Amino acid sequence: MNIAVVDYGMGNIRSVSKALERVAPRAQVEVTSDPGVIRASDRVVVPGQGAMPDCMAQLAASGAREAVIAATRDKPFLGICIGMQMLFERGEEGDTPGLGLLAGGVPRFPAARMAGLKVPHMGWNQVRQAKPHALWDGIASGERFYFVHSYYPAPADAGLVTGTCEYGVSFTCAISRDNIFAVQFHPEKSQAAGLRLLSNFVQWRP
């Protein structure tokens, strides 16, 4: 099995690849921006951390943008943090166009609703499973995962919502559709629960 971890110069790429190697020691995990490698892989992971305008610009500059879009159509696909946000139509940060694969936007946590909570949302928080999914196998609803973000996805289609979290507001932190699963939290930083989710992704047959 070949797993492509898309490298477009933003964030936590190596920690994601190391976590995948740990849960799938027999897999070939390749950190790459090569469109040919991405298209030839069996599974694709798009991590990312930072500002959405920078991430979208870097993805385009890397040459991997179209290969990532193609992967969302026909391969098991995992988006992490910005890799989740970019699937939507537009990010509030810099009024940035996303890939437009999913209807909805990416707003900032509303200051009026935060009641003294700091933004960015940084640290451990509970994830409530909104519906069953193969990637939740062996993970309890309410399990804690690690977050670092100031913006969150707001899907137009409530049917996409697969996990939610509370931080001043209730927000979507996991979505799924067909071969796509994406999370706002960082499984590679989330210890046993995060490794279980990555292991489930490696074994997933959508």
Which residue ranges define each predicted feature?
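Extreme N-terminal starter segment of soluble prokaryotic enzymes
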Residues: 1-4
